[in-house]
From Swiss-Prot:
It is found in: Cell membrane. It comes from Mycobacterium tuberculosis (strain ATCC 25618 / H37Rv). The complex is composed of 2 ATP-binding proteins (Rv2688c) and 2 transmembrane proteins (Rv2686c and Rv2687c). GO terms for biological process: response to antibiotic; transmembrane transport. GO terms for cellular component: plasma membrane. Its main location: membrane. The chain crosses the membrane at residues 31-51, 69-89, 119-139, 148-168, 176-196, 224-244. This is Fluoroquinolones export permease protein Rv2686c.
Amino acid sequence: MRAISSLAGPRALAAFGRNDIRGTYRDPLLVMLVIAPVIWTTGVALLTPLFTEMLARRYGFDLVGYYPLILTAFLLLTSIIVAGALAAFLVLDDVDAGTMTALRVTPVPLSVFFGYRAATVMVVTTIYVVATMSCSGILEPGLVSSLIPIGLVAGLSAVVTLLLILAVANNKIQGLAMVRALGMLIAGLPCLPWFISSNWNLAFGVLPPYWAAKAFWVASDHGTWWPYLVGGAVYNLAIVWVLFRRFRAKHA
């Protein structure tokens, strides 16, 4: 990343990208984060039909009605934490390599670096959401197009995850501990509103991933889901702004 000191604009962004690619394939932990969605998707595609048949045969229980919840728990919400954690570890690598210090004396402002990081997180999250849920074999037909905007809102939640990790962690060991701590908050609690039929489920809106999950559930039920996208985008952006100011103060 020393080459960044003489770069600005698009060339700096290209340098960031090359550094991310090198950093990812050299670190087994980051490689595992990249391929984890493939493993989860395979598990959902292979095991869900088996459990559906077994529960229907033995207990007369229809698991099909819970497919949106399964997709949310194993693919949508995990895409958020995987993309956010991957980006956080790459930033922590940059901190260890002195990149953040070098940025202070280059034409590249910290906002450009963060803008690149946030954009890549949103793109990666959206790709994960669309690809994994489409390949799961249990997604209701006709919902693929709705996964793109839902994936973008999930991407904003992944940016929140990135910034939460960086707000506490100063190295990858601390970052890994933060990922574990955030696991239930991101991939567990947002599933609980599924079981709450009243408007009290909106209380879970304090959790950034809730909005993408709720939008997907409503879309699966053929309801009006766009208000949850708008609300989720506004809420997540507000949190991103607050956390980014802390990030900027920490590394300015």
